[in-house]
Amino acid sequence: MMNMQNMMKQAQKLQKQMEQKQADLAAMQFTGKSAQELVTATFTGDKQLVSIDFKEAVVDPEDIETLQDMTAQAINAALAQIDEATKKTLGAFAGKLPF
């Protein structure tokens, strides 16, 4: 019975640590950039959009498609950074689970 209690205590401790890491990650900001950094997108670690910024050179009413493509590049780059940080931050817990 003692072994089960120790496992539960360890699991609760790991859960608190993981929740703190998730909160830390959510408080961070990640910025993705398009080619030539003409579009930047900034997200929080919990994938909430903070801002999208456009350089004047990319705003051309005759070429909306380029603006759309660069916006998608910037957003995807930021989201990839978040995914990588999440793997690094929370992936460490996978090997520590007591069961």
Swiss-Prot record:
MF terms in GO: DNA binding
Cellular component terms (Gene Ontology): bacterial nucleoid; cytosol
Assembly and binders: Homodimer.
Pfam families (alphabetical): YbaB_DNA_bd
Protein name listed in UniProt: Nucleoid-associated protein Sez_0297
Function: Binds to DNA and alters its conformation. May be involved in regulation of gene expression, nucleoid organization and DNA protection.
Taxon lineage: Bacteria, Bacillati, Bacillota, Bacilli, Lactobacillales
UniProt KW DNA-binding keyword: yes
Record family assignment: Belongs to the YbaB/EbfC family.
Protein localization: Cytoplasm, Nucleoid
Keyword set, alphabetical order: Cytoplasm, DNA-binding
